[in-house]
C-alpha cells in the first residue's frame, strides 16, 4: 500500500517548492492548483480505502529518527484526522480557483505559501510523535504570518504580528507541557519516548498533584488559543479581517486546535486530578464562546469582522460538545469542525467578492447587491443559512448533536448556548438583508457579479454543505468509533 500519510505531506511541499520558482501569475496559480489537485487525489485514495468501522490507526508508518530520545517519524490516519484532511484537500483547490483572476504581487510566493500551509496542517493531522507534531504545528505559523503580512489589508502588519506572537507564546506553553509529559514518563519508566499514544497512556500513572494538572492545562492552553476560545481569541478578528480572502480561508482550515483537543486533551482528561473540574472549565469556555462570539458578531459593521466573530461562536460548539463526553456530543463537535470549514469558506469568499466588486465591506454602505450579483447572492445565502443552523445543511447537524447530547451532563451550559441561537439568526439575517436586498446603493457604481470560475468554486462547496447536511454519514461514521473510544476511556475512569 502507498505511504499515503507521508505523501500527503510531501506532495504539496514538492509543488510548493516548484511554485516558488515560477515567473508568471498563471504558472504560479497553475502549479498551485495542480499541487492541490494531486493532494486531493491522494486524499480520495485514502478515503476510499479507509475502514470506517474501526477506531484503529490506518496507513501507519514509523521510522526511528532520534533513537536516544525515543523520537520516531510516526504518522497515521484515523477517524479523527481523516475528515479534516478531506476538508483541507477539498477546499484548497477551489480556493485557488477563486483567486485565479486576482491581481497580486509575487504570486509565486503567495501560492507557494498556500501549499506549504497545506502540507504543515496535514502534517499535524497525521503526526503520532510529539516532536513531529510540534514541528508541523509551529510550521503552520510561518505561511499564515507572511500571507497576512504581505497581502493583507491596511492593518496587516499589526494583525500578522499579533497573531504570530500570541499563538507562538501559547505554543511555547504547550511545549512546556509536552516536555513535562516526556520527563515525568521517563522518570517512571526509564524509557524515553515522544510517542503521543504511549505518553497519553503513561499519563494515568503520574502522581496526582499540581505537576500532573499543570501538564494537562499547559497543553490544553495551546489548543484553546489556536482554536480559538474565549478569552484567548483576541488575535482572531484582526487576523481574519486583515487577511486576503485566501488567507481568511486558510485560517478557517486551521483546525489543529480542535484536532489537538480530540487527539490529546480529551484522552488525557479522565486521568487529571480533577476531571469533573476540567469538564466544567471546558463547558464554561465553550458556552461563553458561543454566546460572546454571537453578541460581538451582532455589533459589527464590517462584514468580514462579523464573520470572524461568528467563527469564534461556532468554535464554541467544538469545546462544548467535547465537554459533554457523550459519543454523539463528541462526534457532533468533530463534525462541527468539518462543517465550519465548508461554511466559513463560502462566507469569506462572499465577503471577498463583495469587497472586490463594491470597494467596501461595511454593511451599511452596501444594499441591493442581489440585483447586480445574483450568483453570489445564491451561494452566500447557502453559507449564511448553514451558519445559522438551517435544517438540511451541515451546520444544523453539528449543532443539533452537540446541544442535544451535551444537555444530559451539562444542562446549564447548553442553556447558555441556546441563548445564542436567536442572536446568531439575527446577525446573519440582518447582514444579508442590509447587504444584498433592499434598495441598491447607487454610490457603489456599476457592480459586477462574480466570474464563472468563482461561481463554480462557490457552487461546489455550497453543494457539499447541502449534501453532507442531508447525508452526514460518509464523514460522521468515521468520527463515531473514535468518539466512542474517547468516551469509553472516560467512563472507565468514572468520569
UniProtKB/Swiss-Prot annotation:
EC number(s) stated in the UniProt entry for this protein: 1.5.98.3
Temperature dependency: Optimum temperature is 39 degrees Celsius.
Membrane-protein topology: Multi-pass membrane protein
GO cellular component terms listed in the entry, alphabetical order: plasma membrane
Alphabetized UniProt keyword annotations: Cell membrane, Electron transport, Membrane, Methanogenesis, Methanol utilization, Oxidoreductase, Transmembrane, Transmembrane helix, Transport
Domain of life: Archaea
Localisation: Cell membrane
GO biological process: ATP synthesis coupled electron transport; electron transport coupled proton transport; methanogenesis; methanol metabolic process
Activity versus pH, per record: Optimum pH is 8.5.
Transmembrane residue ranges: 1-21, 27-47, 57-77, 80-100, 108-128, 130-150, 163-183, 215-235, 249-269, 277-297, 315-335, 338-358, 378-398, 412-432, 450-470
GO terms assigned for molecular function: Methanosarcina-phenazine hydrogenase activity; NADH dehydrogenase (ubiquinone) activity; reduced coenzyme F420 dehydrogenase activity; ubiquinone binding
Enzyme class, UniProt record, top EC level: oxidoreductase
Reactions performed catalytically: methanophenazine + reduced coenzyme F420-(gamma-L-Glu)(n) = dihydromethanophenazine + oxidized coenzyme F420-(gamma-L-Glu)(n) + H(+)
Segments forming a coiled coil: none
Family matches, as InterPro entries: NADH_Q_OxRdtase_chainM/4, NADH_UbQ_OxRdtase, ND/Mrp_TM
Pfam families: Proton_antipo_M
NCBIfam families, per database record: NDH_I_M (TIGR01972)
Known role: Component of the F(420)H(2) dehydrogenase (FPO complex) which is part of the energy-conserving F(420)H(2):heterodisulfide oxidoreductase system. The membrane-bound electron transfer system of the complex plays an important role in the metabolism of methylotrophic methanogens when the organisms grow on methanol or methylamines. Catalyzes the oxidation of methanophenazine to dihydromethanophenazine. It shuttles electrons from F(420)H(2), via FAD and iron-sulfur (Fe-S) centers, to methanophenazine (an electron carrier in the membrane).
Protein family according to the UniProt entry: Belongs to the complex I subunit 4 family.
Quaternary context: The FPO complex is composed of at least 13 different subunits. FpoA, FpoH, FpoJ, FpoK, FpoL, FpoM and FpoN proteins constitute the membrane sector of the complex.
Protein name listed in UniProt: F(420)H(2) dehydrogenase subunit M
Gene: fpoM
Amino acid at each position: 500500500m502507498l505511504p499515503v500519510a507521508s505523501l500527503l505531506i510531501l506532495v504539496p511541499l514538492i509543488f510548493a517548492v516548484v511554485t516558488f520558482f515560477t515567473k508568471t501569475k498563471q504558472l504560479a496559480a497553475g502549479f498551485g492548483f495542480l499541487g492541490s489537485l494531486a493532494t486531493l487525489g491522494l486524499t480520495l485514495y485514502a478515503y476510499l480505502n479507509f475502514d470506517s468501522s474501526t477506531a484503529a490507526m490506518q496507513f501507519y508508518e514509523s521510522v526511528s529518527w532520534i533513537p536516544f530520545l525515543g523520537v520516531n517519524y510516526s504518522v497515521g490516519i484515523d477517524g479523527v484526522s481523516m475528515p479534516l484532511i478531506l476538508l483541507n484537500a477539498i477546499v484548497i483547490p477551489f480556493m485557488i480557483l477563486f483567486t485565479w483572476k486576482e491581481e497580486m504581487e509575487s504570486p509565486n510566493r503567495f501560492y507557494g505559501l498556500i501549499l506549504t500551509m497545506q502540507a504543515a496542517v496535514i502534517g499535524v493531522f497525521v503526526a503520532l510523535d510529539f516532536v513531529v507534531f510540534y514541528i508541523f504545528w509551529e510550521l503552520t505559523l510561518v505561511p499564515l504570518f507572511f500571507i497576512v503580512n504581505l497581502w493583507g489589508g491596511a492593518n496587516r502588519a499589526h494583525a500578522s504580528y499579533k497573531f504570530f506572537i500570541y499563538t507562538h507564546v501559547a505554543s511555547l506553553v504547550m511545549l512546556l507541557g509536552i516536555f513535562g509529559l516526556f520527563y515525568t514518563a521517563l522518570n517512571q519508566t526509564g524509557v524515553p519516548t515522544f510517542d503521543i499514544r504511549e505518553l497519553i497512556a503513561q499519563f494515568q500513572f503520574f502522581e496526582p498533584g499540581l505537576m500532573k494538572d499543570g501538564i494537562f492545562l499547559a497543553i490544553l492552553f495551546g489548543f484553546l488559543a489556536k482554536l480559538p476560545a474565549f478569552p484567548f481569541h483576541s488575535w482572531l478578528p484582526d487576523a481574519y479581517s486583515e487577511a486576503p480572502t485566501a488567507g481568511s480561508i486558510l485560517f478557517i482550515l486551521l483546525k489543529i486546535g480542535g484536532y489537538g483537543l480530540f487527539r490529546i486533551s480529551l484522552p488525557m482528561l479522565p486521568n487529571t486530578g480533577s476531571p469533573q473540574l476540567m469538564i466544567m472549565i471546558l463547558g464554561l469556555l465553550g458556552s461563553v464562546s458561543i454566546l460572546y462570539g454571537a453578541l460581538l458578531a451582532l455589533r459589527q459593521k464590517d462584514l468580514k469582522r462579523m464573520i470572524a466573530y461568528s467563527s469564534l461562536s461556532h468554535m464554541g460548539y467544538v469545546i462544548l460538545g467535547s465537554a459533554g463526553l457523550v459519543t454523539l456530543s463528541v462526534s457532533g463537535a468533530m463534525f462541527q469542525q468539518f462543517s465550519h470549514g465548508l461554511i466559513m469558506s463560502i462566507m469569506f469568499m462572499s465577503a471577498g467578492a463583495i469587497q472586490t466588486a463594491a470597494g467596501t465591506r461595511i454593511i451599511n454602505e452596501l444594499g441591493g447587491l442581489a440585483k447586480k450579483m445574483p450568483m453570489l447572492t445564491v451561494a452566500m445565502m447557502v453559507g449564511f443559512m448553514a451558519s445559522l443552523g438551517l435544517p438540511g445543511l451541515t451546520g444544523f447537524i453539528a449543532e443539533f448533536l452537540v446541544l442535544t447530547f451535551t444537555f444530559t451532563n451539562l444542562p446549564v451550559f447548553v442553556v447558555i448556548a441556546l441563548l445564542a441561537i436567536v442572536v446568531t439568526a439575527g446577525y446573519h439575517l440582518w447582514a444579508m438583508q442590509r447587504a444584498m436586498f433592499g434598495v441598491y446603493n447607487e454610490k457603489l457604481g456599476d457592480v459586477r457579479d462574480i466570474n464563472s470560475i468563482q461561481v463554480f468554486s462557490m457552487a461546489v462547496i455550497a453543494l457539499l454543505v447541502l449534501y453532507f447536511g442531508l447525508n452526514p454519514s460518509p464523514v460522521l461514521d468515521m468520527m463515531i468509533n473514535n468518539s466512542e473510544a474517547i468516551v469509553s476511556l472516560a467512563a472507565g475512569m468514572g468520569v
